Regions:
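Feature captures hydrophobic
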Residues: 2-129
Length: 129
C-alpha cells in the first residue's frame, strides 16, 4: 500500500491577497461603473520571490487568477505591478495605498497613464484610500 503524502500544502501570501482583492473588487457595485469597457490583465510580479500571477478583468469582473503571465509585454491591455511580495500583499489587501507605494519607490507600474489613473480610482473606491 502506497503512503499518502501529508506534506502541508504551501500557500502563497500573494495569491491569497489576490483572491481577497478579487472578492472585494467583484462585490463592489461602484467599481463596476468605473470599469465599464475596461478589460485588462493585471500582472502582479513579486521582485523578491519571483512569483507572478495574472488577474483577468473582463466584462465588469475580476474573472480569474492564473499563475505566470502569457500576455506579451507590448500588449496595451497588460498592466504590470512590480514590488516585493510584502508590498504587493499589502497593496492588494488595502493596507498600503498604491500611490504611496509608488512615491516610496516600493511599487513600479507599467501601463498607460490612463490605466494608472483608473487603478488609483479603483483603490479609492474599494478601500477609501
Amino acid at each position: 500500500m502506497a503512503a499518502t503524502d501529508v506534506t502541508p500544502v504551501q500557500t502563497s501570501a500573494l495569491l491569497s491577497s489576490l483572491h481577497d482583492f478579487q472578492r472585494t473588487f467583484n462585490e463592489n457595485q461602484r467599481v463596476k461603473k468605473l470599469i465599464k469597457n475596461w478589460n485588462r490583465f493585471l500582472k502582479a510580479e513579486s521582485t523578491d520571490t519571483s512569483e507572478i500571477f495574472t488577474v483577468t478583468i473582463q466584462d465588469l469582473a475580476a474573472n480569474e487568477i492564473q499563475p505566470g503571465c502569457s500576455i506579451p509585454e507590448d500588449n496595451e491591455d497588460l498592466v504590470t505591478l512590480q514590488a516585493s511580495e510584502e508590498a504587493l500583499v499589502r497593496i492588494f489587501t488595502g493596507k498600503y495605498n498604491p500611490a504611496h507605494a509608488l512615491i516610496d519607490g516600493a511599487l513600479a507600474v507599467f501601463c498607460s497613464e490612463r490605466d494608472k489613473v483608473k487603478l488609483e480610482a479603483i483603490a479609492m473606491v474599494i478601500w477609501g484610500l
